[in-house]
Amino acid sequence: MAEITVELVSVERMLWAGQASIVTAQTTEGEIGVLPDHEPLLGQLVENGVVTIQPIDGEKLIAGVSGGFLSVSKEKVTILADFAVWANEVDTASAEADLNSDDELAKARAEAGLRAVRRSSEGL
């Protein structure tokens, strides 16, 4: 099976690095899927989007991201997000409460996290 090296990094931490069979991300140009040997590209991630990674040896990983960039070369995908959180790390009650916050950063992070949770529950 063909594979591609993937790194998902936020301002706060490295979320994941490893080999994957496909990566999808929501960019300002639309949702894209990246397979091994993809043509090089640079894309801007949408605010409050979702990134999915299918590792070669495990279950699909789903993260909510807010802003940043996606860089693709023949051998590697690098996702540099302003904020990123795994769907399974999101406290949905707290995130839903943050949707009503006056703090725009907290609201954006809540939206990104809840989108990841929804995508995860859809099984896509």
UniProtKB/Swiss-Prot annotation:
The keyword Membrane belongs to this UniProt entry's keyword annotation: yes
Endpoints of the signal sequence: none
Subcellular location: Cell membrane
MF-aspect GO terms: ATP binding; proton-transporting ATP synthase activity, rotational mechanism
Keywords, comma-separated and alphabetical: ATP synthesis, Cell membrane, CF(1), Hydrogen ion transport, Ion transport, Membrane, Transport
Any one annotated GO CC term: plasma membrane
Membrane topology, from the record: Peripheral membrane protein
Subunit structure: F-type ATPases have 2 components, CF(1) - the catalytic core - and CF(0) - the membrane proton channel. CF(1) has five subunits: alpha(3), beta(3), gamma(1), delta(1), epsilon(1). CF(0) has three main subunits: a, b and c.
PANTHER family, alphabetized: ATP SYNTHASE DELTA/EPSILON CHAIN, ATP SYNTHASE EPSILON CHAIN, CHLOROPLASTIC
Family according to the record: Belongs to the ATPase epsilon chain family.
Role: Produces ATP from ADP in the presence of a proton gradient across the membrane.
Protein name as it appears in the record: ATP synthase epsilon chain
Source organism: Corynebacterium glutamicum (strain R)
